[in-house]
Every structure is written in structure tokens, then in C-alpha cells.
């Protein structure tokens, strides 16, 4: 089956054609600041991005005769995971989303191209997947509720692939999935639902190459009211200039891991501390799953690092078997989900937020 995949990022647009799960063509480009300067809001980029996609297809002589079109999910209202048919409610919510991001355009472009092809249009496992159990939402401050923001697409895709590799369904397994990238998310996957996971974007859980993770609340409050920093600067400390970047002045884990493996400080101490926070979070998810864990999956770019994987395994491999599935293949994950929906192997969800 011919599956067309669209993945708009803040400064790039990537597209690919798959025959079943095999990529047969890919293209894309980085959009410069000049390219996007005329657009004051992301929604205004719709025609520009759509025409860009159609031009690349025309230049490659690829006709619009796909069996399905699937796009990266946007910043919708919280919704359970799965493959969703693009509907009018979804398009309305993307056009009126609280947060602007180019990923909101993916489903809109996919829907229009799919209409020309007379084929279904999907999204799968957007970043806003929310399957938290009730106890995981509450905090000690009633005005603050925990929210689910994590690497849903990759985490669920590797979970399904692992399940298939052992002759099981994702919905039969309990898994801890550790996504190791610029942000780090550690989720408890209970029979196909992520019932607890740290907010990998906004200051919760392990610290990461660019993010601060959980910070002692009293000290953070004092920092906020010290008069030294603006709200924007504090938020940048939490996401963008936190973690390894704050300690070491770099986010290049390949370089940091090489120095750490040679015993060079402060690289070894800081990287080992980051991995310690990851292991602690995995331990917390072990408790969430009441010790009934079939496997711990390590995925994301940092899972390519022998040093990081080795340190983590020393701390968590007594909990459950550790499975290595490094990297992050968003395009392949989207194609995998579309194929599953076309074959009837993955149930098609209807977007109806509460």
C-alpha cells in the first residue's frame, strides 16, 4: 500500500512515500527566517507549506494516488493515543489551537491531499496523548495539575514493534519506555495505555540535554522572586538552557559521553547524574506498574550511546529485561500506524475531545 507521510516542523517540512513499511522516497527542506518572515501567525503558512509539498511531489513525478495520507499530529486537546481519522472537529481545534506550532498544519494539508486522492487521512499519537490515571494528575497544590506531554508517537511505535517481535499485542504488555533525546520522557505503559509519564517539556522528571527536569520547589520560587530574572528567562532555564546545557555549556551527548568515558570531569559527574535521574524515574514507573513489567525499552537518540546505555543498565536491569531500540523515526512510525489502520490491525479512533 502507498502511504504518504507529512511532518511539518517549526522551520522544516519533511515528506516521504512508503510502500507498506518500506520508505521509497523522501524529500524536504529547511525554511529560512526569510522564507517565513511574511507570516505573522503559523496558520498563515498553510498555503505556503501545502504548495511546497505539492511542488516536491510534482518535481519527483509522483502522482496523487495514495492509499492513505498521514501527518504528524498537532497540539490538539488532550486525547487518548491511537490512529485518528482527520475530521472537522480536529481541523477546527488545530486552526484555533491555544499553542501555535507548524505541526498543527500537518493534518490540514494531509486532509486536502487525501481528498484529491479519494483516500483516508490520518494522524497518530500526537504529543498531547493523555491517558493518565486519576491519581497521576493530582499534586499537592490544587491549582496545579500534572499534564501529559511526552514523546507519544515514538514511545508507542517502539512499544508496538517490540510487542510484535515477541508475538504479542501492545495491549497485552506492561512496559516502561524511556525516550532519551533533547527531552527525556519515562512512561508506564499499562496494557496499551500510558497511565503515568513525566511532562518531558515543562520541568518535570529527569533532567536532560536541554531541560531542567524536576527542581526543588522552594529554591525555584526564591529564584523566580529574586528580581534577577524575567519569567521568560526562568522558562528558558527549565526548557532550552537547562540540564547538560546549563552545567556544561553544550548539549552534544556524543562529545559529553566520550569525555565521560575517559573519566574527564565535570562531564562524567554531570552525565552520570542525569542518567541517575532517568533511572530513578524508571524505578517510579516500576512502582506505578506494581512490579509487573515485561520490559524496559530504551529509545531516542541517546540510546545510541554505549556509555549512557551501560550506565543505565547497571541501575535498572534488575527491574525487568532492558530492550534497546535506539533512534527516533517519526516518518516510519507514522507510516507504521497508517498501515496498521488500513489493514484493520489498529482500531481507528474518532476525535471527540471532552
From Swiss-Prot:
Q: Extract the InterPro entries matched here.
A: Aliphatic_acid_kin_short-chain (IPR000890), Aliphatic_acid_kinase_CS (IPR023865), ATPase_NBD (IPR043129), Butyrate_kin (IPR011245)
Q: Kindly give the Pfam families that the UniProt entry links to this protein.
A: Acetate_kinase
Q: Does the keyword Cell cycle apply?
A: no
Give UniProt keywords alphabetically: ATP-binding, Cytoplasm, Kinase, Nucleotide-binding, Transferase
Q: Which chain positions lie within coiled-coil regions?
A: none
Q: Which organism is it from?
A: Phocaeicola vulgatus (strain ATCC 8482 / DSM 1447 / JCM 5826 / CCUG 4940 / NBRC 14291 / NCTC 11154) (Bacteroides vulgatus)
Q: What is this protein called?
A: Probable butyrate kinase
For this chain, the family text in UniProt reads: Belongs to the acetokinase family.
Q: Which GO terms describe its molecular function?
A: acetate kinase activity; ATP binding; butyrate kinase activity
Catalysed reaction, written as an equation: butanoate + ATP = butanoyl phosphate + ADP
Amino acid at each position: 500500500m502507498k502511504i504518504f507521510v507529512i511532518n511539518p516542523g517549526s522551520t522544516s517540512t519533511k515528506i516521504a512515500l512508503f510502500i507498506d513499511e518500506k520508505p521509497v522516497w523522501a524529500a524536504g527542506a529547511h525554511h529560512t527566517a526569510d522564507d517565513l518572515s511574511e507570516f505573522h501567525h503559523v496558520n498563515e503558512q498553510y498555503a505556503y507549506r501545502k504548495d511546497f509539498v505539492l511542488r516536491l511531489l510534482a518535481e519527483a513525478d509522483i502522482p496523487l494516488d495514495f492509499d492513505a495520507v498521514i501527518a504528524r499530529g498537532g497540539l490538539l486537546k488532550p486525547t487518548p493515543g491511537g490512529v485518528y481519522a482527520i475530521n472537522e472537529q480536529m481541523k477546527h481545534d488545530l486552526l484555533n489551537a491555544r499553542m501555535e506550532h507548524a505541526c498543527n498544519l500537518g493534518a490540514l494539508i494531509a486532509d486536502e491531499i487525501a481528498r484529491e486522492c479519494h483516500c483516508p487521512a490520518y494522524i497518530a499519537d500526537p504529543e498531547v496523548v493523555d491517558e493518565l490515571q486519576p491519581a497521576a494528575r493530582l499534586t499537592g497544590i490544587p491549582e496545579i495539575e500534572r499534564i501529559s506531554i511526552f514523546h507519544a508517537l515514538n514511545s508507542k511505535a517502539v512499544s508496538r514493534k517490540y510487542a510484535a517481535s515477541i508475538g504479542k499485542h501492545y495491549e497485552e504488555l506492561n512496559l516502561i519506555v524511556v525516550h532519551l533525546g533533547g527531552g527525556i520522557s519515562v512512561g508506564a505503559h499499562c496494557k496499551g495505555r500510558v497511565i503515568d509519564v513525566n511532562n518531558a517539556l515543562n520541568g518535570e522528571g529527569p533532567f536532560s540535554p536541554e531541560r531542567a527536569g524536576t527542581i526543588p520547589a522552594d529554591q525555584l520560587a526564591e529564584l523566580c522572586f529574586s528580581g534577577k530574572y524575567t519569567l521568560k528567562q526562568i522558562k528558558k532555564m527549565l526548557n532550552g538552557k537547562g540540564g547538560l546545557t546549563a552545567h556544561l555549556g553544550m548539549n552534544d551527548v556524543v562529545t559529553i559521553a566520550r569525555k565521560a568515558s575517559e573519566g574527564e570531569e565535570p562531564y562524567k559527574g554531570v552525565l552520570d547524574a542525569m542518567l541517575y535521574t532517568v533511572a530513578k524515574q524508571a524505578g517510579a514507573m516500576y512502582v506505578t506498574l506494581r512490579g509487573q513489567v515485561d520490559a524496559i525499552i530504551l529509545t531516542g537518540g541517546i540510546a545510541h550511546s554505549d556509555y549512557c546505555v551501560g550506565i543505565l543498565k547497571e541501575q535498572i536491569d534488575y527491574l525487568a529485561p532492558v530492550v534497546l531500540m535506539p533512534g527516533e523515526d517519526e516518518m516510519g512510525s507514522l507510516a507504521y500506524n497508517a498501515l496498521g489502520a488500513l489493514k484493520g490491525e489498529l482500531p481507528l479512533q474518532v476525535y471527540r475531545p471532552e
